[in-house]
């Protein structure tokens, strides 16, 4: 699976989801939410996955919440 805002890997029963937007402290936007849902659904249906690890890229923040720029441009109505 290829994602724009996430890095998603599965190895030895561990699914790793990394929010990969460190330039905005991993703030989520509509794309991020849709991709997160897809990755979690994939991990859920994979019988080999026993654990899901979610983290943010970079060393400054896990996730600061919603992306203010997207909210200003019309919000999360997509």
What are these language model-derived features?
Residues 1-57, 74:
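Conserved CoA-thioester-binding segment of acyl-CoA-metabolizing enzymes
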Residues 56-78:
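Glycine- (often His-adjacent) and acidic-residue-rich active-site loop
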């Amino acid at each position: 699976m290829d994602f724009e805002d996430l890095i998603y890997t599965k190895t030895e029963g561990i699914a790793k989801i990394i929010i990969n937007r460190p330039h905005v402290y991993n703030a989520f936007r509509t794309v991020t939410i849709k991709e997160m849902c897809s990755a979690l659904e994939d991990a859920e249906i994979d019988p080999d996955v026993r654990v899901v690890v979610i983290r943010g890229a970079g060393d400054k923040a896990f996730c600061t919440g919603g992306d203010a720029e997207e909210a200003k441009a019309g919000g999360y109505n997509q």
